[in-house]
Amino acid sequence: DIRTAFPGIRGFSVRSLRYMAKFAREVESEFCSDYCRIPWGHVMKLLDKTEPGERREWYLAAAVENGWSQAVLDHQIDLRLYERQQVAGKVTNFERTLPSPDSELAQQTLKDPYIFDFITAKQSAKEHDIEEQMVSNVTKLLLELGTGFAFMGRQYHLSVGSEDFYIDLLFYNTKLRCYVVIELKNEKFKPEFTGQLGFYVAAVDGEVAGEYDNPTVGLLLCKSKDDAVAEYSLRNVDAPIGVSEYRLGDELPPEYENILPSPEDLMNRI
């Protein structure tokens, strides 16, 4: 009897023993120490929701690096973060406009699509309405943007020459060590969007960024995009820009609808 062999040690319920057996079957011995860096509840979640292999190891590493709670780990698996952060299929010009390894890190940081499940808005909603909800839920926004993002401001004012300009959202990323300009478009991608964002990126480089900051990166978030059109639009753009789609809470595809906790429930458990 296990309880007799290990008196005073708890956690040997039938359920836990089944997870222990599954862990022994599926986790190779050289990786066991990695799993010791997260609580047992996290391990059970990984065993439940992922198969052995690269995808599971990616979520394990992300949970350790970011200090995710069990609720956040569960949420990120449900939102398919691993799939959304894969480099293949992302529309950027980072490889051409940023030095290595910054280009690879920026590419890895980008997601497509972004899932803003904490925002509900009508189809006809204005961009500033969506921005307001983002800023009102800035903790959730930062969670979706990913590691290292710090919020600098909404409608961030830039004075260039004798004119005034306002950036939708400005962030600083401590991993990239650069400013990130986000422009939000509540419509399908258009080629002219890259010109405006390219100007904002250049202006932040010239007016805001410091001597030791890396080149500013631009992120254009659109309701939808034609990848071929977006790729051609970036081909001759010198500013580092990525183009991604985004989804709001009332626009999630069917596979997400029944698996997500409410934003309130998620944040109460973080």
Model-derived segments and spans:
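Basic, low-complexity intrinsically disordered segments
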Residues: 1-270
